[in-house]
């Protein structure tokens, strides 16, 4: 592929990623991506075998962008490690998950709808490791012994709850993270009551 062709292909992928962010999988069509990229709709056949390839590339670009944002915030947390307490780590975690190129509601609508599209869900699953790694790095700054998957689930759940109830996502997630961190990380086995005698 020529340099010009590569540039056009990347423009189409960026356009498709933007459409995916704002309108979900149904918004991503060859024609819509070409229109947003100021290219002829017929040109898309030169750069993609089919619609699914374009959709997969758009999803990969989005998950890379989210992981990059989280990674940048993880870098910041590590650079300020000596000054970082639990309160700071909570803020870093929230920023890593709430900072998105698209409006937060659109982002979560996209994630929810992705489950109905195997192409997108596969792309997100494949790229999830980088996001998990960034969250793990932030947790490590304050030696918080929680799996990244658990923390991400708490944050995602808090954001969806807040959006559905018209509450502030940041404040809602902050409360949930504080509750999580306040829980004991290891529970002692429940003691058994001594047997009763007649």
What residue ranges belong to the model's regions?
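Helix-turn-helix
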Residues: 11, 19-57
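Hydrophobic alpha-helical connector segments
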Residues: 70-103, 148-151
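Hydrophobic/aromatic-rich alpha-helical bundle segments in the mid-to-C-terminal region
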Residues: 120-125, 138-198
């Amino acid at each position: 592929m020529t340099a010009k062709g590569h540039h056009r292909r990347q423009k189409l992928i960026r356009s498709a990623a933007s459409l995916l962010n704002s309108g979900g999988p149904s918004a991503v069509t060859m024609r819509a991506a070409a229109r947003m990229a100021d290219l002829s709709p017929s040109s898309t056949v030169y750069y993609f075998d089919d619609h699914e390839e374009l959709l997969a590339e758009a999803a990969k670009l989005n998950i890379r962008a989210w992981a990059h944002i989280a990674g940048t915030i993880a870098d910041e947390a590590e650079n300020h490690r000596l000054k970082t307490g639990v309160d700071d780590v909570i803020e870093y975690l929230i920023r890593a998950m709430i900072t998105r190129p698209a409006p937060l509601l659109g982002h979560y609508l996209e994630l929810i709808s992705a489950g109905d599209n195997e192409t997108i869900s596969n792309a997100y699953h494949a790229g999830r490791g980088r996001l998990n790694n960034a969250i793990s790095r932030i947790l490590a700054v304050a030696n918080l012994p929680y799996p990244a998957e658990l923390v991400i689930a708490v944050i995602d759940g808090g954001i969806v709850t807040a959006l559905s109830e018209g509450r502030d996502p940041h404040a809602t997630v902050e409360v949930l993270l504080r509750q999580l961190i306040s829980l004991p990380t290891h529970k002692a086995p429940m003691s058994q009551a001594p047997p009763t005698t007649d």
